């Protein structure tokens, strides 16, 4: 069994030292309660609405404040989130796995919302790497930050890369109050739908830790959860209340679910790779749909009025333009063909 503790906290905006002290306090409380994995929310060390404060609270990975916090994780796995500053002085919203006194893994937020009340791209750079990581728990962890999970490729890639436990740390504001929603809050209903769907589709545990409290008039709703690999809620923390919430899970559930429902086994990665390559080139205006005539818009998977012999070979290209010679080989380069204007 693995005991998971969700630290649903209300960090103080810009008060790095105070938030570090609160993290150490809750880590020790979780340790005393027998926790194996402790998860804090997005930017739990700094608060969310930082804007120009981001430069003041940013830490490099060798910052003594971060390494001191890591030193408090003996015999524990802890996920914390902070503003990371790179060697070239870019700032990232980061989530780090601290284990046995070390910084073991760092994920930089991939998708920075800059719409509505969000303005992250003004102050942060986007990450460009996604990796699952082994852990002392005996399971692979896939760590993502808030908006990352609004892009379905992220949980899928983490699970395919070896994650059995998907961890999302979040600072999600409460929006869309309506009695018609399951919990009276549209944001919460949306996140709950996402977490259950991802758990089922990846046959993984999903750990969602959201903050509470208020930053600059923005209210965060909490509602942290642990979802089992068949999509059932194992733990649901209350909305808006601060606290440390724990639950025991058996990682054997992942094995049982993946044997009975082998979705990851049956993913056709070579097909995805090939078709994604085609889509990328089409979006860049450098290739046509594989079934379209030159000058025609992208068509069907198989052109319905084409004779059988045409379906089995690529369309003719204008003189001097190379055609697709991969013959279905996903490792072959995709032809770089520009659309006619």
Please place each PLM-identified region on the residue numbering.
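Short amphipathic alpha-helices and their capping/turn segments at secondary-structure boundaries
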Residues: 21-35, 153-162
């Amino acid at each position: 069994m693995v005991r998971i503790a969700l630290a649903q906290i209300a960090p103080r905006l810009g008060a790095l030292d105070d938030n570090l002290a609160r993290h150490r306090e809750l880590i020790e409380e979780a340790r005393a309660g027998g926790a194996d994995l402790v998860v804090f929310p997005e930017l739990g060390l700094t608060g969310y609405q930082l804007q120009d404060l981001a430069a003041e609270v940013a830490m490099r990975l060798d910052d003594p404040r971060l390494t001191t916090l890591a030193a408090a994780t003996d015999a524990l796995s802890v996920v914390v989130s902070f503003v990371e500053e790179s060697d070239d002085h870019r700032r990232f919203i980061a989530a780090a796995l601290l284990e046995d006194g070390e910084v073991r893994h760092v994920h930089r937020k991939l998708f920075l919302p800059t719409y509505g009340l969000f303005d992250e791209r003004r102050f942060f750079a986007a990450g460009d790497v996604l990796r699952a990581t082994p852990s002392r728990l005996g399971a692979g962890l896939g760590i993502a930050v808030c908006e990352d999970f609004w892009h379905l490729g992220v949980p899928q890639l983490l699970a395919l890369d070896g994650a059995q436990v998907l961890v999302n740390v979040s600072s999600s504001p409460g929006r869309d109050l309506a009695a018609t929603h399951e919990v009276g809050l549209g944001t919460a209903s949306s996140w709950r739908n996402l977490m259950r769907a991802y758990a089922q589709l990846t046959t993984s545990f999903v750990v969602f830790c959201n903050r509470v409290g208020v930053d600059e008039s923005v209210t965060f709703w909490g509602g942290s959860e642990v979802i089992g690999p068949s999509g059932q809620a194992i733990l649901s923390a209350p909305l808006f209340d601060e606290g440390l919430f724990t639950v025991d899970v058996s990682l054997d559930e992942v094995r049982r679910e993946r044997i009975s429902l082998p979705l990851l086994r049956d993913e056709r990665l070579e097909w995805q790779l090939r078709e994604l390559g085609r889509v990328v080139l089409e979006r860049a205006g450098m290739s046509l749909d594989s079934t379209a005539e030159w000058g025609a818009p992208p068509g069907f998977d198989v052109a319905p009025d084409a004779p059988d012999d045409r379906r089995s070979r690529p369309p003719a290209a204008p003189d001097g333009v190379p055609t697709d010679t991969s013959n279905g080989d996903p490792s072959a380069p995709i032809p770089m063909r520009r659309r006619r204007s």
